[in-house]
């Protein structure tokens, strides 16, 4: 009898505790997204119906206030819906939100210690060291390598069109982007268009092929529940992809140092940072090989590999998506396609270049309309559909009576905000001219596809150049066949990116 009563009492107390936990925001008077216990707002993600980015966009669309209280599993979090507040959090109030709150374990898992994950002083010191790597002078120095991959892209498409006039443009752009990363970041001589079975491509392809449950749990817990990711690593979980790329990078670094091999790429700059503690100015000497005794090196191979893997994950997906979606949208808007193609032709003529010539950094910088096309693409299809921060000290929300407590995860739905008609007229259309300097008919606070403030994307300049080269090379050498207008739908993916449900197919013809 007493056992039954005790069980009922414990069950009642547990129910009351759980109910109280999942109505926390409601009791504070904060607009709240109802929780599906025990998943919170993650039920569609856990059922693999929606990606995390699209699930957050769904919540964004269902509410109207500045902030929405949500539950990521059992973690009390805040979704920011107000563009001005979101920008303020990442810029002027950065001191209260200087970390992302994702998994990192510098001591036991140095491969997790990348610029995206790091916290506090560790992040600040590394950011200062890496920032010179992405100056316009450094990118100009690496441009020849980027352009070489662009030429291989054109050659591949010319061969593919001999078989069919239809191509899966996202797949093609992914190969292009991965080869740039392999060449510029990892210092490899590769051509995945001709040799898709090369070691780097095989390793990188396994990131999308690996459907193991452990990988999905680890990937999602890095964002949603870092202690689970930390526990998995302490128990021996290790990313085969990361360790394979680390070993590949180690061999390349050792070969370069042993044989005094110098190449104008990001790896050369990372080697210099490892050996000297700094990267240096935009001059020819920055590419020189400088070595140091192992005990004097400022960064381990693991930490170098962690940064390279971050650049791979962020750079390959964002470049592939931006270039593929730009071409896809232009194919549906013939007047914009004509304008873009005519600009490419005019700029090539201005710089005395033919479509098959090596492009120059200066010519690509002159493609101003293509700039705003890519700006509109990454508004509509942000490479990372949400931004995340962690509240690092209690923060009074401006214009409200609410206080965000220290330790609370903060989420900003870029997909939701950048498709909100409050901020962008006709948000589901494709209108590059909204970014014309004499137009600007949108709320500039709401546009932040690369993040904002001190933790904005460090490689945004290189990402834009990579995408522009791909699109410009294709427009210079091929005509896009007009496609019927159709909205893209997205499917579940454990990684925090946009993955289309259906292939992005385009029809091309060779230009006469």
Curated annotation (Swiss-Prot):
Record-stated family: Belongs to the cytochrome P450 family.
This protein's record includes keyword rRNA-binding: no
Membrane-spanning residues: none
Entry's Gene Ontology cellular component terms: endoplasmic reticulum membrane
Annotated EC: 1.14.-.-
Residues where heme binds: 457
Main localization (coarse): endoplasmic reticulum
Keyword entries, A-Z: Endoplasmic reticulum, Heme, Iron, Membrane, Metal-binding, Microsome, Monooxygenase, Oxidoreductase
UniProt name for this protein: Probable cytochrome P450 6d2
Purpose: May be involved in the metabolism of insect hormones and in the breakdown of synthetic insecticides.
Membrane topology (UniProt): Peripheral membrane protein
GO BP term, example: response to camptothecin
Subcellular location: Endoplasmic reticulum membrane; Microsome membrane
Top enzyme class: oxidoreductase
Protein source organism: Drosophila melanogaster (Fruit fly)
Cofactors named for this entry: heme
